[in-house]
Amino acid sequence: MVKALQGAAQNLPADVNQLIDQLERHCLAPDGSLVTKSVYSDLQLAREEMSRERLRYLEAMAIYCEAVAMVEEYQQAISVANHGGIRDVQGLYPQLGLKNSPQVYETLEHRLVVAEAAQKLRLPLISDGGEIHEEEIEKWSILSRSSLDSASTSFTISSTSNSVNYANSSANSVAGGISLSAVDTDVVGGVPNRFLGITPAYLSYVQLQNTISMDMADYQMFLAREIEGRLKEKCDKLADAIVDDTDSSTGNRNSSARLPERVKFIIEEIERDEAALREDLYSADRKFAEYYNVLEQILGVLIKLVKDLKLEHQHKYNEMQKTWLCKRCETMNAKLRVLENVLLLETYTPDSISALHNIRNYLVEATEEASAAYNKAVTRLREYQGVDPHFDTIARQYHDIVKKLENMQWTIHQVEMDLKSHD
């Protein structure tokens, strides 16, 4: 856009160009986005903060996913042992990648359940020292009471912060629960401060009562080591998947250490490819615009040729064709009149006129007799209908009886003929 302004500035006065240069030098951002320097610096800070937040979120989500996967694999081992009657459950741990005792996984599962329930209740987590801040409790309690449905809209700012805080604290085994008095007053969206029948007071009681028998430091160390090992294994697999031919030929084993460099190199290569493709696209667009302009010019020339040359001759040809068709129609009309006169001449000869008169008289007499018979029949029918309104029904029944009688007579005649043939 700055280049466009610079191109347009060539036609502007000198004082306007000087003003634009001063604005670009002292007020506008150096990237050509046409925003002020203060806004540009705030935007850069916001982008850096968003990048850091995204990095923290991804780290927390990776730890949380590994913790959930550990609990699922532990439950899978227990299920296989129960169905298969295996007494040595710990023998299945190495096959599933589990390296700690059942107490660690049970404690982790318990803390996951409590933390997720606290998140659904929109409650703050217990602090590192086990203390509960009354100010935060009151704030979140007011937010929870004002909600109509505490279970349907869990993706809010509070639930997001709780999930991030919990995912960060899952490796450090920070307990999740709080002590609140349950409010049992029904509202439109259900009972507030409840989720599937779980109240804050019950959640706090479960969290504070269920303490593990092992040392907290050992629990945190075991959990952190296993999560670190699982993440490192996945990083090694990812590095092996994207390693180039040079590294694979030299047999470099320290692939996880160079993973960020490889990822950065691949990202830069993809960005270069995208820039090249974008440049090709712009070049293709420019060529297409040029081709389109040439085609428009060619089309204009063709239209001019058609209008100036071909259409003029076409109009003359159409006029001649119309005249020829009109003459042909007149000729056909004359031929039809001739055929009509010939037909009349051949039909009305001196010999056939007397015969035609006789035929006409016969047809007139036959028409009069038929009309008289029809009128007589109509008159008699009306007389019969006047005598009996059901005459039509009786006549139809009589007709049916006569047909049946004729059929019976024909059948009797056939039987008599068969008997005579047998005699």
UniProtKB/Swiss-Prot annotation:
One of its GO terms (biological process) is cell division. One of its GO terms (cellular component) is HAUS complex. Its main location: cytoplasm. It holds the Pfam family HAUS4. It is found in: Cytoplasm, Cytoskeleton, Spindle; Cytoplasm, Cytoskeleton, Phragmoplast. GO terms for molecular function: microtubule minus-end binding. InterPro entries: HAUS4. The keyword Cytoplasm applies. Residues 267-287 form a coiled coil. Keywords: Cell cycle, Cell division, Coiled coil, Cytoplasm, Cytoskeleton, Microtubule, Mitosis. Disruption phenotype: Lethal when homozygous. Belongs to the HAUS4 family. Part of the augmin complex composed of 8 subunits. The complex acts on microtubules and interacts with gamma-tubulin in spindles and the phragmoplast. Involved in microtubules reorganization during spindle and phragmoplast development. This is AUGMIN subunit 4. The lineage of its organism: Eukaryota, Viridiplantae, Streptophyta, Embryophyta, Tracheophyta.
